[in-house]
Amino acid sequence: MIKLESLQDPSPRKRRKKLLGRGPGSGHGKTSGRGHKGDGSRSGYKRRFGYEGGGVPLYRRVPTRGFSHARFDECVEEITTQRLNSLFNEGEEITLDALKQKKAIDKHAIRVKVIVKGELEKTFIWKDANVVLSQGVRNLIGVA
């Protein structure tokens, strides 16, 4: 037999939807649970993600961790002797701008390093201070 004290709330799926704006007896009349004035009482209002009622939100209370070096990193590219052989002709000057023009390096690069891969089949002019030669390339062309 069912007794009054043994009654349970219906499961959330069977619970009646709360009716808003249907008189003071419903508990959700007049302002329909929205309170008086302010943004929350207006139609179309949605709280910003992380908003905590005007207090300092958690994401601002918790200290930041780590450090990003991206702002200070210099964009240094590398290019092989094999690639230089295919891109440039005999006796051409190899500069940062020439490499950027031929799209051999990134347009944001501020320095390029030449590394050994295969032989250097042609002679080039190396005057640009932003084109750095590795020790192996220096040995190939005979510069100490």
From Swiss-Prot:
Transmembrane segments: none annotated. GO terms for cellular component: cytosolic large ribosomal subunit. Disulfide bonds: none annotated. GO terms for molecular function: rRNA binding; structural constituent of ribosome. Residues 22-32 have a biased composition (Gly residues). It comes from Chlamydia felis (strain Fe/C-56). Keywords: Ribonucleoprotein, Ribosomal protein, RNA-binding, rRNA-binding. Part of the 50S ribosomal subunit. Binds to the 23S rRNA. The keyword Ribonucleoprotein applies. Coiled coil: none annotated. One of its GO terms (biological process) is translation. This is Large ribosomal subunit protein uL15. Residues 1-52 are annotated as: Disordered. The keyword Repeat does not apply. Belongs to the universal ribosomal protein uL15 family.
